[in-house]
Amino acid sequence: MKKRMLPCGLAVAVSLAVTAGAVQAKETIRLSTYVNESDIRYDGFKKFAELAAEKSNGELDVQIFPSSTLHGWSEGVDAVQGGVSDVSWIPADKRLSCYRVTSLYPADINLEKQIELDAAYAELVRDEAAKVGLVPLINSNYSYDQEWWFEEPIQDLSNLDGKLVRSIGPLVSSMIEAWGGKPVFVAPKEVFQSAERGVVDGINMGVATYSSWKLWSVMPYMVNANLFYGNIMYMMNKNKFDSLSTSNQEALLEAAKEAEVWLKPRYEDWVDQRVGNAVMKGGGAAVSIENEKRLAMIEAAQASWTGEVDAACGEQLANEVRSLFASYGN
């Protein structure tokens, strides 16, 4: 009897092992973002998580951590390398020298083909990212809404006359200095207090982030300059990505691209609404720079930034980046 029962018992054991293996196959991916839950981009990350689960038949579980809860603004590379998060936004980090000086770039971009442009740009920085253990995953394009906000009306953005202006990176700092201002670095969640206390006279920030943190009460005057290509890329730990099955790698990449496509029109509509709401609630105004002046400012910024890009990227990659942006220009 015992000998006859053994195959049955073995079958049960094998069945349990297979079931346990199936449970263990589910991969948790922790995604860290600086945006808060009232930001439309948070909905984009939720869509990404839904698509990743759907395309992987439930094997990928993307967990979203908003409002910089896992790490600070400048700590994305360290967080991903150290396992604090699996996917994080990547700031202007010196370990990614070319990305640092080109992920925000002075350019007159046609955003009709933004998704294709972002994908092509991600390919150009892929090798650099791999060298520090990262894989580009999600493009977070903020070209549409990266603008300037001030406590008082300003006549000429190119004449800041000593104003202290919040900067987000090396390019913006160089532009602020070229316009006679003084750049000040302030993390997104600290901008409101800095503006309220007079630490800064103006800020460079995306409309989405500006609105999410309700900054219209302290910085109600907007200058719509439209000077940049901007892409704060979300990158994944390369070892974590490589450990996924081929099908789940493909599922994750497809989910990222589809979420970008899903978010783009919603993001732009949301930004447009927030500009109107911000001006109305803050009692301020939104002014645009005339096109001839705008193009001259972009050209001057590009010329001053050429040496930085060449040094950081190397001549060949620098030329490829500039050629890419030019090919998607207006």
Residue ranges of model-derived segments:
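Catalytic cores of large soluble enzymes that bind and process phosphate-bearing ligands
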Residues: L117
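Bacterial N-terminal signal peptides that target proteins for export
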Residues: M1-L10
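Bacterial N-terminal signal peptides
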Residues: G9-A17
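N-terminal secretory/targeting leader peptides
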Residues: Q24-Q114, D127-N330
